[in-house]
A protein has these predicted regions:
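Ribonuclease/tRNase effector modules and their secretory precursors
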Residues: 1-109
Length: 109
């Protein structure tokens, strides 16, 4: 069960860098995307330059982040806050068309 105090205090990664907590990367991410390593995802997480809450997600509160790894590749990451920090259960490079469209639509609003 997710602790609502944690979610209220740290409702987004960018809003609370100093209290981010632990980052967990689901093992399936690396199994499905062998071009990524755990280090690639962690570096991209640390270099996040785009964050969006997905309010209509069935996994609410689900976030989309985009960051750059140590090779300069853009990595899309999707995850949720947990009691201890954050769980990333999707990561991919290059950015998917769906993600690019989502970012473009958000910029138009």
């Amino acid at each position: 069960m997710i602790d609502n105090k944690v979610l209220q205090y740290c409702s987004s990664k960018l809003a609370c860098e100093e209290t981010m907590g632990e980052l967990t990367i689901h093992p399936r991410v690396l199994e499905r995307h062998p071009q990524l390593t755990e280090e690639d995802v962690r570096v991209a997480w640390e270099n996040t330059y785009y964050e969006a809450l997905r309010p209509d997600s069935p996994n609410f509160p689900e976030y989309l982040w985009i960051g750059a790894d140590s090779n300069g590749r853009e990595i899309e990451m999707v995850g949720v806050p947990t009691v201890d920090g954050w769980l990333i259960y999707h990561a991919n490079t290059p950015l998917s068309k769906r993600t690019r469209n989502e970012v473009e639509d958000a910029r138009r609003r």
